[in-house]
Each structure stands twice: as structure tokens, then as C-alpha cells.
Amino acid sequence: MINVNPGKRGKYSNAKVGVYRPLNPQKYLGSQLPIYKSELERLCMRYLDSNDLIVSWSYEPQAIKYFDKAHNKVRHYYIDFIAVAKCGNFKKTIWIEVKPESETKPPRNKKDFKAATTYLVNTCKWEAAQQLAKSKGYEFHILTEAQLK
């Protein structure tokens, strides 16, 4: 079990880290309480937990293999969320990645190597997730603070 102090800053970032306690635990499919690593992840957990159209959800349940063009390596990444949503008379599975909007667009400053690398790695991950989700008949969405706040 990971020892996490809610509201504390993450080891590798300035993000708040904490344990999310679902209000509707029957909807959460994890074996342990989910640990959010950012405010956006916490907001997404709250949205999935409280939305009546969401039947079930899980946090970081699926490893996806992708080719990291920035570092020329095959890597794995865990999709942030998988949700099953009611859509009329049927259900659909949605893979969700949560990112700050600034990381979903090419950097404005072409000389910002860190931002350019982050964007390139993210697009590699998202292309792999999109392809795999589509092959399984699922949807893939990237949510930012604009959709979650």
C-alpha cells in the first residue's frame, strides 16, 4: 500500500497528491482507493463518481505500449481512467486521459525543449491509446481543466 498524505505535494512535481474516497463505491472498480496525482485527476474522479450516466470507472487500469519518439524507446503508459457510460439503451467504454490544456498543444516557444519533448511524448501516447481503443470499439478522450472545472 502506498503511504500518501492527502494534500501533500508530489515527489516529482508540484501537484497535490491524495486518496480519493468515492461517494459511490459500487461504481469504482479498483481493489484499493485511487490515489490522485493532480488536481485535474481529483476533479475527474469526482466527476466520474457523481455523474449518473457513468456506470463504472477505474483509475490507471490499462497499460498501453507506445513508441516514444523523443527518446527512441518502446515504453508503457497507464491510461488515466476507463469509464463505462450509459448511452440511451446501450453502454459505451471510454478511455480518458487528463492533462493540463498547455500540454495538449504544441509549445508556442519553439526553443522550449522541455515543453516540446512533453508534447511529443504525449502525442505518441495518445496516438497509441487512440488506435488501441478504436480497435476494441472504445472511445478515447483527452480532458483538460476546461472540461473539468
Q: What residues fall within each predicted segment?
A:
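Electrostatic, structured charged patches in enzyme active sites and in nucleic-acid/phosphate-binding
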Residues: M1-K149
